[in-house]
């Protein structure tokens, strides 16, 4: 468009009514007449069925006017009521945006935008193969409809290089699933939500909401990735130490198969301050519904004589074991204690001889054992999330939450009366139950809430209804908020007293097979990790003196272009060892420990990789930063592998002892661990 549009005068002259601009897309007898729209819709259907269906069903719209000039790139869209338009000059504005973005972000694999505009900018940006993924959130459905009728984005949508969200449908759960993908994870630190043009300032509140949801998703993803190698090693140690107890005990899969779809309603009992007022109602309805108690709730239920069917626990620390100190043989009869295999040995000691079901979490370090009979349960960091997932797996169609405050009570209490621990002081706020006002919460509780919201969103696809009957605390999006008594009167009407079948412990022959299988996995893991460690140490000893010399030159201001070839050679040596680590047959034993050892360094490397380097000296300086980070990268990986090797060897003693006792092996070939090793 060669000149600025005179808003009011041009309406009805050079404009094309939205209905006219989209006449090719009108559907007659279920057929799409516009081939561009048809191709786009078919591609979009693969990534967002709901949005595609909504667009397919749209008829004539009249909120926006479309202006098309002689140049096919000269497309503007105007709000008919406010006379606000997306571009001052479509061709120039798009060219300027493209030039500015490519100058600053041309090496960014992932980019985020608020506003689709006329779609041409994203078509142009994706000509740069470096941009692997572009995510666009558009607040106006009609604008999406217009663009998909005018611009062929079918290849970009089908390949998912362009991911398109309609703001009204977009939520935290969708963003989390996107961000959690490998190609997004590494570039988390590069997140920036660009506003397409000033036109989208009219949607400031929505932009802020979308930005917050993306930020929350990234934060949750980073938390889920784990940020402590010590925590991971404790988990590995506990899991391997507990293998004999898990394999010879009750099987999680056997339990689920035996009890699947036997009950419609599950009540998950947490220890929030609101639990006190729910106990009488819980006692009344416990015989007619599945009761899943969190570990911390168990002593409270024991005290009030309310018998749960399951008690869940996921923590690896010794403090959790205190919840199981008190035993009541009659009360505990037929209760299944569903506990993550990475729990502390004292927790196991305190629970036994009760019905203990150790379960494997869906983590790579536990997947390698291929013990499907004992897993998989426990995504997230909270036993409340574990309990919700258990309720879902058992086939319940109604899941009721009580005591799930995830916030401080008005009087400052963090847990129900009788709970063993108090929550540390923090000052974060979130939307209150009922949607009115805010309540004080903590960073950890907020992460638990995020996981709940993700699980609830997934459960809806299986027609599972989630009721938050806490009647206090924080709002959990996606859950139906109703009083506990009202919900239970409805769900338990005409229900009979439950009578759930039990299972036996795993047969000896099956246990023997899995014990030997675990031993072989550990043996192979140690062998591959030791090989990888030696290769990394070899490269480390070669390149670090060279890197240190180059860093010295940098500190002295003596960096020149002549260093380029030397830096490339160092970088290539590092790349070779990286290629070894990601070999398919090695990766399953290396990926977890390597990823957590260098996670934050990888985020820094991602920032370096996208930095501009147009001149020769810029390229040299960028490579210096690159190899400098890799010096610590190599050191961290070697250290992480060594810690995993020693932890695994030491933790395997229980397994070796059990194998020898059963006559399955005569001696171990795992090698001796360093008794004084500490992580």
Which residues make up each language-model segment?
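Polyanion-binding loop/helix "lid" in catalytic or ligand-binding cores
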Residues: 426-473
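Acidic, Ser/Thr-rich peripheral helices and adjacent loops at domain boundaries
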Residues: 154-157, 312-317, 325-333, 416-430, ...
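Acidic/Gly/His-enriched mid-domain segments of enzyme catalytic cores or analogous surface patches
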Residues: 144, 148-228, 302-394, 597, ...
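Short internal beta-strands
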Residues: 134-139, 289-297, 309-315, 336-341, ...
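Class I S-adenosylmethionine
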Residues: 2-12, 16-110, 118-127, 228, ...
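Long, compositionally biased charged/polar accessory segments in the mid-to-C-terminal portions
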Residues: 461-679
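Glycine-rich phosphate/pyrophosphate-binding loops
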Residues: 297-298, 305-315, 391-418
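The AdoMet/dcAdoMet-binding core of the Class I SAM-like
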Residues: 25-58, 63-72, 103-108, 112, ...
């Amino acid at each position: 468009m060669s000149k600025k549009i005179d808003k009011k005068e041009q309406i009805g002259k050079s404009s094309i009514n939205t209905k006219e601009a989209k006449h090719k897309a009108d559907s007659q007898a279920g057929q799409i007449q516009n081939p561009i729209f048809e191709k786009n819709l078919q591609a979009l259907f693969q990534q967002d069925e709901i949005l595609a269906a909504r667009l397919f069903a749209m008829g004539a719209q009249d909120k926006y006017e479309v202006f098309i000039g002689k140049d096919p790139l000269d497309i503007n869209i105007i709000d008919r009521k406010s006379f606000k338009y997306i571009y001052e000059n479509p061709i120039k504005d798009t060219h300027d945006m493209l030039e500015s973005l490519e100058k600053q972000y041309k090496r960014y694999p992932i980019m985020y935008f608020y506003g689709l505009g006329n779609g041409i900018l994203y078509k142009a940006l994706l000509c740069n193969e470096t941009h692997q993924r572009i995510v666009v959130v558009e607040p106006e459905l009609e604008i999406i409809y217009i663009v998909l009728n005018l611009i062929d984005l079918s290849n970009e949508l089908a390949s998912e290089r362009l991911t398109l969200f309609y703001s009204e449908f977009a939520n935290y759960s969708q963003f989390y699933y996107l961000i959690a993908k490998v190609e997004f994870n590494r570039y988390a630190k590069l997140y920036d939500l660009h506003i397409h043009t000033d036109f989208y300032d009219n949607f400031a509140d929505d932009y802020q909401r979308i930005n917050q949801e993306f930020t929350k998703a990234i934060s949750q993803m980073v938390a889920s990735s784990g940020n402590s190698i010590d925590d991971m090693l404790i988990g590995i140690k506990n899991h391997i130490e507990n293998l004999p107890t898990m394999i010879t005990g009750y099987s999680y899969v056997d339990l689920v198969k035996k009890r699947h779809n036997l009950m419609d309603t599950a009540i998950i009992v947490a220890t929030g301050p609101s639990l006190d007022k729910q106990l009488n109602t819980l006692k009344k309805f416990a015989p007619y519904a599945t009761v899943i108690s969190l570990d911390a709730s168990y002593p409270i239920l024991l005290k009030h004589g309310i018998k749960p069917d399951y008690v869940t626990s996921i923590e690896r620390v010794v403090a959790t074991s205190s919840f199981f100190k008190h035993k009541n043989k009659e009360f505990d009869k037929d209760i299944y204690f569903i506990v993550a295999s990475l729990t502390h040995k004292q927790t196991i000691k305190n629970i036994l001889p009760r019905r203990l079901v150790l379960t494997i979490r869906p983590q790579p370090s536990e997947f390698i054992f291929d013990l499907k009979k004992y897993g998989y349960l426990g995504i997230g960091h909270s036993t409340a999330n574990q309990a919700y997932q258990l309720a879902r797996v058992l086939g319940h169609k109604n899941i009721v939450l009580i005591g799930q405050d995830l916030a401080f009570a008005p009087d400052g209490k963090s847990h129900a009366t009788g709970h063993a621990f108090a929550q540390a002081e923090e000052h974060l706020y979130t939307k209150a139950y009922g949607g009115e006002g805010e309540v004080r919460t903590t960073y950890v509780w907020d992460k638990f809430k995020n996981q709940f919201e993700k699980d609830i969103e997934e459960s809806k696809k299986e027609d599972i209804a989630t009721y938050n009957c806490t009647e206090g605390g924080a709002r959990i999006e996606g859950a139906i908020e109703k009083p506990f008594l009202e919900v239970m009167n409805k769900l338990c009407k005409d229900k009979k007293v439950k009578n759930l079948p039990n299972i036996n412990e795993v047969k000896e022959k099956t246990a023997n097979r899995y014990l030997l299988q675990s031993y072989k996995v550990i043996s192979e893991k140690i062998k591959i990790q030791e090989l990888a460690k030696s290769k990394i140490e070899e490269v480390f000893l070669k390149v670090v003196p060279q890197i240190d010399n180059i860093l010295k030159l940098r500190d002295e201001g003596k960096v020149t272009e002549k260093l380029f070839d030397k830096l490339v050679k160092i970088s290539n040596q590092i790349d070779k060892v990286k290629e070894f680590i990601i070999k398919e047959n090695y990766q399953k034993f290396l990926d977890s420990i390597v990823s957590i050892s260098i996670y934050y360094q990888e985020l820094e490397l991602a920032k370096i990789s996208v930095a501009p380097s147009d001149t020769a000296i810029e390229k040299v300086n960028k490579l210096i930063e690159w190899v400098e980070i890799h010096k610590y990268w190599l050191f961290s990986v070697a250290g992480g592998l060594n810690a995993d090797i020693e932890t695994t060897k030491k933790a395997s003693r229980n397994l070796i002892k059990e194998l020898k006792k059963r006559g399955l092996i005569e001696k171990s070939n795992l090698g001796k661990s360093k008794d004084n090793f500490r992580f």
